[in-house]
Amino acid sequence: SVILVYLVGGPPHQDMFDLKPDAPREIAGPWKPTATNVNGVEICEALPMMAQRMDKFTVIRSLNDAQAGHDAVQCYTGRTNAGQKPAGGWPQFGSLVNKIQGQHVPTTPGFISLCYPCTHGPYNEPGPGYLGPAHSGFRPLGPTRKDMILNGITTDRLSNRKALLASFDQFRRDADASGTLDGVDAFTKQAMGILTASRLAEALDLSNESEATRERYGTGDPKKSIDANGAPRVPQSFLAARRLIEAGARIVTVNYSKWDWHGGLNAEGRANNSIFVREKEDFPVFDKGITALIDDLYERGLDKDTAVLVWGEFGRTPKISAKVGRDHWPRVACALMAGGGMRHG
């Protein structure tokens, strides 16, 4: 299984995992490196919980050849938008896994997206591409969650409704050459599994966790985005991802906060977007949430079978700008990995 955490907008890796303390101040940034529990490895002093668990993480500092403009397609497909694309577009990796391996548990979708919609289109997931809608990620966020249980309808009545729907579909089957009805069939099967078993709904109900566990991850308001065109800062999405993996999902995607810190005022003109301000706000919350996820995976014996990948679409400029921010830098970036039975540290 894989949990992919997309840091919307591209995080400043040289202020997190690849500090340059001996460089001039306009390059070195606001932080000092701190030692970790891995000999010779240092990370940002604002990430103390990760530093204590660095033997459970791997930092890749050599990612390159990204496109310079924002586009989540890079993180979800491993491809840029340059060059010729197939009809329908490239599928994101969750859709590919869903196509090849299918569901691990009949009542839990194989690919689940916990990504919040972003008003800036390129920040959103690219979708199933040429694989078609049958391999889209299941999206349980929002008001539809209350519809994932049967309200006064027996399973017999539900089965009768499914049979009636199938008979109507058959009238159109021969005339359909687009593959759309194949997607409808997949959605119907998925919906039946969700409605006739409580496993998915229970996994999404975080009140089933103890208050102490929820506190370990930290809290956030999904209705409040730091920048309206990014994702909200909700570390409990990491907790939901872990619960969904336990419920049988193969792939869970999460988008987290907004990391496009060019300096000056943010997109709404209501907050200071300098790295000196935003990093002090974001780093501690991220540090707490991601380490809680990794601790949970190890404590529950999921670390061998569940890989966690954390990254953004590119790196940030080595030199701090006149606005006290870092701009886009596609030449090099980093990724953070954990679990998956990999050798870490």
In which residue ranges do the predicted regions lie?
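Ligand-binding pockets and gating/stacking loops
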Residues: S1-G345
